[in-house]
């Protein structure tokens, strides 16, 4: 837990619970479920190219590595983390960088992983890479139209100074 309170903030709106650290939250009903246990694959090891190293790309890589696959991450920026890097730079949100740090620590402990930074790939680059599987985890952005979990409709924000981490 990084203390971001995403889980409890959804309760007030009657929305399903979610978590920045545990993407399998609310899966407790599944037999033999545990958020940290990933079964090894029963088939041969596959190779995966993950394009993007934000929270979703890193979590995908972490789980695939635990399942015994070979993972290569191509990141367009100079560091991993995606938008979390910007969010963690905001006042009071410094601990959010743990979303990235936990996953990077797990990934770096694996001998089946490679990460390439400053690597913006073209379609031919992806095709020539010859991975068994390709996963696009190319990011998300803050909305600037006022729509959010507490406000499902857009509104005019033209007369406001609207700031986002971007």
Predicted regions and their residues:
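Short glycine-/acidic-enriched loop or helix-start segments at secondary-structure transitions
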Residues: 12-13, 60, 83, 145-147
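Cysteine-cluster motifs in flexible loop/terminal segments that predominantly coordinate metals
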Residues: 1-40
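Short loop/edge segments at beta-strand edges and connector loops
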Residues: 78, 116-120, 164
